């Protein structure tokens, strides 16, 4: 009797396990489960669940630090070599001598390049939201240089305070000496570094898709899962967005280097798909990154620079301000702050340290500064939410694995 009872219990457990495994193998069940899990993760944000979000964020940070510590330990010889190199550079940096002028020059250029590369990476990677650093930093910088160049008739701004502050040089430039190419050359370094940063930011989708294809293991990345689903239903795609994505995928897959170059050179929101496509179809790294770097850091950046420089050239700006005044009823009142802002900028360009009281701040510049602060603050919040949701995904995957083994 006892043996029969034991056999019945084993059969009951086995049947339950088979039924459970069958549920997990059902595509509709898995799809519904993924949808529920995704909705649950998306609800973990600071303004809905602040305590859980902060807790998950801290745990995800600790896990990330642990993973990086393990990776660095496995590459300890390289870490030691880098530390020795930094020690030698520190000695060279702090020892007095005639070489200090070159050290200061290299330090200034390296920090300047690193700043713009970092902003480019932030703009490209985004971590869930994207910090549009071209609109917030590079675009206004190019616009300021353009306005200053036409006002000063020169781009030889005193260093310092340039690039932190732009003032006209002591010697007056010749009227009409400024050309489009002069301004392009002045801002070429920072623009190319920003473009290189955006190219570097496109690498994570490429490496993720490539690793998933080579390993044959189903990835947990939602964008890659959507890409595979799009390929499966390519023949039945009806909506414009899906057809546009398929067009980008076909261009990159069939044309190769030139197709990637074309996608990277033209501002478009679908280039992330190009990185996933290249990784999925095992496009060589240097083919993908080389085309992306040339397209974003050279071709696309020159297009964007030309647009900003032409838009903020002296006669265009004056025409735009005059056109604002033509707007019925609100035109004159709306035109006044723009005129005051431009006049304040002209005075600031000719302002010297010993020229009296500082200039009063215009409300347009004040509003733009507050907009930048709000955007950066929102970006930080999005990072916290994104990392908290990443930890929630770990918890869901762990729970799913336990359920599969029952």
UniProtKB/Swiss-Prot annotation:
Keyword Metal-binding found: no
Q: Which UniProt keywords apply?
A: Cell membrane, Endoplasmic reticulum, Lipid transport, Membrane, Transmembrane, Transmembrane helix, Transport, Vacuole
Give the Polar residues compositional bias ranges. 18-28
Q: From what superkingdom does this record's organism come?
A: Eukaryota
Give the GO biological process terms. Answer: lipoprotein transport
Residues assigned to the Cytoplasmic compartment are: 1-49, 98-110, 272-273, 328-363
Query: Which compartments does it reside in?
Result: Endoplasmic reticulum-Golgi intermediate compartment membrane; Cell membrane; Vacuole membrane; Endoplasmic reticulum membrane
Provide the transmembrane region boundaries: 50-70, 77-97, 111-131, 251-271, 274-294, 307-327, 364-384
- Assign the protein's first listed, main location to one coarse class: endoplasmic reticulum
Question: Extracellular topology: which positions?
Answer: 71-76, 132-250, 295-306, 385-406
Q: Where is this region: Disordered?
A: 1-35
GO MF terms, alphabetically ordered: phospholipid scramblase activity
Region (VTT domain) spans which residues? 173-316
Known catalysed reaction(s)?
Answer: a 1,2-diacyl-sn-glycero-3-phospho-L-serine(in) = a 1,2-diacyl-sn-glycero-3-phospho-L-serine(out); cholesterol(in) = cholesterol(out); a 1,2-diacyl-sn-glycero-3-phosphocholine(in) = a 1,2-diacyl-sn-glycero-3-phosphocholine(out); a 1,2-diacyl-sn-glycero-3-phosphoethanolamine(in) = a 1,2-diacyl-sn-glycero-3-phosphoethanolamine(out)
Q: Which GO terms describe its cellular component?
A: endoplasmic reticulum; endoplasmic reticulum membrane; endoplasmic reticulum-Golgi intermediate compartment membrane; plasma membrane; vacuolar membrane
Q: May I ask which residue range the UniProt record assigns to the signal sequence?
A: none
Membrane-related topology note = Multi-pass membrane protein
What is its biological role?
A: Phospholipid scramblase involved in lipid homeostasis and membrane dynamics processes. Has phospholipid scramblase activity toward cholesterol and phosphatidylserine, as well as phosphatidylethanolamine and phosphatidylcholine. Required for autophagosome formation: participates in early stages of autophagosome biogenesis at the endoplasmic reticulum (ER) membrane by reequilibrating the leaflets of the ER as lipids are extracted by atg2 (atg2a or atg2b) to mediate autophagosome assembly.
The UniProt comment on domains reads: The VTT domain was previously called the SNARE-assoc domain. As there is no evidence that this domain associates with SNARE proteins, it was renamed as VMP1, TMEM41, and TVP38 (VTT) domain.
Family, per entry: Belongs to the VMP1 family.
The identity of this protein, by name, is: Vacuole membrane protein 1
Provide the species name: Xenopus tropicalis
